Amino acid sequence: MSTKEKLIGHVMKEEPIGSRNKVTVVGVGMVGMASAVSILLKDLCDELALVDVMEDKLKGEAMDLQHGSLFLKTHKIVADKDYSVTANSRVVVVTAGARQQEGESRLNLVQRNVNIFKFIIPNIVKYSPNCILMVVSNPVDILTYVAWKLSGFPRHRVIGSGTNLDSARFRHIMGEKLHLHPSSCHGWIVGEHGDSSVPVWSGVNVAGVSLQTLNPKMGAEGDSENWKAVHKMVVDGAYEVIKLKGYTSWAIGMSVADLVESIVKNCTKCTQCPRWSRGMHGVKDEVFLSVPCVLGNSGLTDVIHMTLKPEEEKQLVKSAETLWGVQKELTL
């Protein structure tokens, strides 16, 4: 008898039930690993699978996490370039793709990443046909649409990280300006995750107090407090981080974990993810835009009907047109 057989006596004759909350992260770059670590630290899965085409880096990252498993509640961390390792995942997070370069807009990345998705998405579907598919790769709104088309999944099971991070940046900067914790500052960024995103100034509030009621010019030209600069800082934030450290990672990783938590814990929490938006607020094209929605264990279950001012609605339509201008040229 082996040491293991002498030590452990089996009670069950059949094989134990496998993972119930398996999460896969595709891509072990900076964003992928920040997402993986954030998911592990929040104890959101009982098994974590990592996939990448770069075998040495993949093996090294997996070993590094495994060596720290004593300090985590998730000890089963697996990795392989073969997608069979992802089988029966509850959530699959796709971070793989070409990295955004300094000064490069997210939309310029699109065709390079579409070609990568043509390999990734069918493999995910093959091994986890019932998963919730979460796209993080940029440009995330267009690639969420691409993932939906390539997967054949119903719309509620294909989401993106969207403007969840944009809104977090917005609330952080607002908090800095008001000397309050971001959780006390409420405001939404909708539309594209990127340059044409739309701040919903009419909904910005602290403790239910509308800031635009206190300052009717908030977010507009002629505002002596220049709140419009807050949104500019949100848009420029990623570019500034890339300029300073070469890439973004930690904030988007934490944002991804926040979305995964809403799914695996069935939080039914309001967040903002790209969803199919034709017919909403005057949007005419088949695009995915971030709007307030509800995430639970079935995916994106509900959408919140925002009350937008005419100018905000106009900006949202323009954001949709910006995405459609690129999306309609794609070869899927």
Swiss-Prot record:
GO CC annotation: cytoplasm
Binding residues for substrate: R106, N138, R169, T248
Domain of life: Eukaryota
Biological process (GO), any one: lactate metabolic process
Alphabetized CDD domains for the sequence: LDH_1 (cd05293)
Keyword Nuclease applies: no
Reactions catalysed: (S)-lactate + NAD(+) = pyruvate + NADH + H(+)
Gene3D superfamilies listed in its UniProt record: Lactate dehydrogenase/glycoside hydrolase, family 4, C-terminal (3.90.110.10), NAD(P)-binding Rossmann-like Domain (3.40.50.720)
Pathway: Fermentation; pyruvate fermentation to lactate; (S)-lactate from pyruvate: step 1/1
Class of the enzyme per the UniProt entry, highest EC level: oxidoreductase
GO molecular function annotation: L-lactate dehydrogenase activity
EC number of the protein: 1.1.1.27
Keyword terms of this UniProt record: Cytoplasm, NAD, Oxidoreductase
Compartments, as annotated in UniProt: Cytoplasm
Binding site residues for NAD(+): 29-57, 99, 138
Function: Interconverts simultaneously and stereospecifically pyruvate and lactate with concomitant interconversion of NADH and NAD(+).
Record note on quaternary structure: Homotetramer.
Family the entry assigns: Belongs to the LDH/MDH superfamily. LDH family.
Official protein name in the record: L-lactate dehydrogenase A chain
Organism: Sphyraena argentea
Source species taxonomy: Eukaryota, Metazoa, Chordata, Craniata, Vertebrata
